[in-house]
Amino acid sequence: MSHKRRGLVIYQDQKQQQQHPPGQSLSSISWSPTRRPHHPLKQQSTNSFSEILSKSSVQPNVQHDGNHMPISLLVLKQEHHKQQQQQQQRQNIRSQNSTPPLRQLVQESQWTSSASNSSLKKQEKQPQTFYNTDSKLVSQLHSSVKDLDAIIQTHKPKFDTIIRDFSQATILSSNELLIKLPKDQTIILHSRAPKINAEWLQNKVNDPSASLVIDSRSFLTLCNNIKWYLHWKFI
């Protein structure tokens, strides 16, 4: 079958016209691919650029060692270590300068007081058992020592007795001076400092204005009416 248009003769195949629906151009028919049934695309692993970027953005949590650690992390780690050292030093200084609490001081003072009291009690018990004898001399000496100690602890020295004649003086030691008084009385002067010597005694005896004053309460009675004085001085 042929058609004549503007001087052109176009031949049309009847078989192709039956295969293709009307309204479709010959050019589209001649260049269209053979129709095949379409199936959905299967998901396949691709190596696209977007997938590479997505994988590269998610990095595993890798623990860095000291040799491959970034400089920023090293600086932060050193700064943190320095702050810890400074904080520890401040705590040590506070602990050294801090005073113990009041409760601890009270407990320690009570413990010290009880210990001192117990030690004093032990010291008092020992002489009592030692002097618990039948000897009159030991008993008298023990009683005199206790009386003298009580006087010294509770009274201040009071020089109430004056001795002007001490020409009959004998040096017993650098701490002891024996003086014979009228009426067969003998006293011994005890000096805590070793100041008694011949030159010292000669100067006192040769000085007409020198006088000896003693505290009549601070003495210890020895045998044969001899009194041992602790508080005395020359004026």
Swiss-Prot record:
Annotated spans, Disordered: 1-47, 78-128
Composition-biased stretches (Low complexity): 84-98
Composition-biased stretches (Polar residues): 20-33, 106-128
Name of this chain's protein: Uncharacterized protein YIL152W
Organism of origin: Saccharomyces cerevisiae (strain ATCC 204508 / S288c) (Baker's yeast)
Source species taxonomy: Eukaryota, Fungi, Dikarya, Ascomycota, Saccharomycotina
